[in-house]
Amino acid sequence: MANNNKNNLRVGIDIGTSKVVCIIAENTSEGINVLGLGIQNSIGLRDGVIVDIESTVAAVKEAVSKAELMSGKQVTKAFVGIS
């Protein structure tokens, strides 16, 4: 996951055919601590190909927003996968 800032935050976004998932986590001395998770239905992909960019962007924004709300952190960069 992308290193988001000095707090060792990591952010990953998975854009899939059925859903978009955003996870916000941090590295600690004990391991990885998940701070927030956002899941949103995806309707802009078909067979791993983006067919409706506006719907895909909206789903990503919503998943990120949910993860930010849960974690209390703001996402500035992330690793993104499309499947």
Regions found by a protein language model. Name each.
Residues 16, 71-72:
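Short, solvent-exposed loop/edge-beta patches enriched in aromatic
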Residues 52, 56:
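Phosphate/oxyanion-binding active-site loops and adjacent basic polyanion-contact surfaces
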Residues 8-14, 77-79:
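Short glycine-aspartate micro-motif
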Residues 45, 72-83:
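Short beta-strand-loop/turn "lid" adjacent to the catalytic site in phosphate-handling enzymes
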Residues 13-19, 82-83:
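A short acidic Gly-Thr/Ser loop motif
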Residues 1-7:
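Entry/capping segment at the start of metal-dependent catalytic domains
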Residues 57-68:
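Short, well-ordered amphipathic alpha-helical segments that serve as non-catalytic structural scaffolds
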Residues 18-51:
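Short glycine-rich, Thr/Ser-proximal phosphate-binding strand/loop in the N-terminal lobe
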